[in-house]
Amino acid sequence: MNSSCCPSSSYPTLPNLSQHPAAPSASNRSGSGFCEQVFIKPEVFLALGIVSLMENILVILAVVRNGNLHSPMYFFLCSLAAADMLVSLSNSLETIMIVVINSDSLTLEDQFIQHMDNIFDSMICISLVASICNLLAIAVDRYVTIFYALRYHSIMTVRKALSLIVAIWVCCGICGVMFIVYSESKMVIVCLITMFFAMVLLMGTLYIHMFLFARLHVQRIAALPPADGVAPQQHSCMKGAVTITILLGVFIFCWAPFFLHLVLIITCPTNPYCICYTAHFNTYLVLIMCNSVIDPLIYAFRSLELRNTFKEILCGCNGMNVG
């Protein structure tokens, strides 16, 4: 990535080829080559990027075409899919650029390479902020569904959801520009780390509160007949909350190594053990791209309506309810 994340080496670097000047000496100390940078073939990044793009485009098409999916939660999922597409597109384009540079088929100026590097890093930054904000928006949506069920449709309308999505992407665009402007400052990394842990803590608090309330509520209505439809509605709300909890868990699992990488760059850039960890940067990028691949699978697994819409789109069927 940019020099604020990964110290520059003797040749132009991009995320997929991040180098650390101290790594060779650390490797010699280890004696086993553990600190050597992990090399991942460009084909892996390209394959993950293509699969992720196709999956997330399918998610967006499904929500747009099926009127039954025109609800705030699914619009937020569309926005999350767009964020996943952005990170996959960024890494794929960057991989292609790295291949071109290494093949010597084109001679590119260092200034141009650095400029493109900042753009790709900015795209990843935008994707990260968008993912966090959309996950938080979905968490709030589920929170309102459970705690204010009777007023949900007046509190969280489609218009409000779309306005919130637009606001999220405007803020993400501003963050992307700021990332390029202050690309040499470590404060960019500090801000990303702070946002990540603050949002995770906030979402964790919301979900704990939701599940504790839902558990108590289910216990209270367990003995009552479900004639009024309260139990099925509560079950539907909880199913949505469980789905988003799974998404949040996968997000944390896939992004946490990358953020630990950033933390170590800030706190112990010369420590041999920290250098060993940061030498596996490419592995953390693969995990990030895997998150973009896994998310659509979670949508399909947890939503029968979305799964059926996927089948109808892929099979070219016309029996779809368009709203």
Swiss-Prot record:
Topology term for the membrane: Multi-pass membrane protein
Subcellular location: Cell membrane
Residues carrying a glycan: 2, 16, 28
Predominant localisation class: membrane
Keywords, ordered alphabetically: Biological rhythms, Cell membrane, G-protein coupled receptor, Glycoprotein, Lipoprotein, Membrane, Palmitate, Receptor, Transducer, Transmembrane, Transmembrane helix
Molecular function GO terms recorded: melanocortin receptor activity; melanocyte-stimulating hormone receptor activity; neuropeptide binding; peptide hormone binding
SMART domains according to UniProt: 7TM_GPCR_Srsx (SM01381)
Cellular component terms (Gene Ontology): cytoplasm; plasma membrane
Tissues expressing this chain: Brain.
Origin superkingdom: Eukaryota
Residue spans crossing the bilayer: 38-63, 76-100, 119-140, 161-181, 187-210, 246-268, 278-301
Segments on the Extracellular side according to the record's topology features: 1-37, 101-118, 182-186, 269-277
Lipid-attached positions, S-palmitoyl cysteine: 315
A GO biological process held by the record: regulation of heart rate
Membrane side Cytoplasmic: residue ranges: 64-75, 141-160, 211-245, 302-323
Its biological purpose: Receptor for MSH (alpha, beta and gamma) and ACTH. This receptor is mediated by G proteins which activate adenylate cyclase. Required for expression of anticipatory patterns of activity and wakefulness during periods of limited nutrient availability and for the normal regulation of circadian clock activity in the brain.
Alphabetized PANTHER family for the sequence: G-PROTEIN COUPLED RECEPTOR (PTHR22750)
Family per similarity comment: Belongs to the G-protein coupled receptor 1 family.
Protein name as catalogued: Melanocortin receptor 3
Protein species of origin: Rattus norvegicus (Rat)
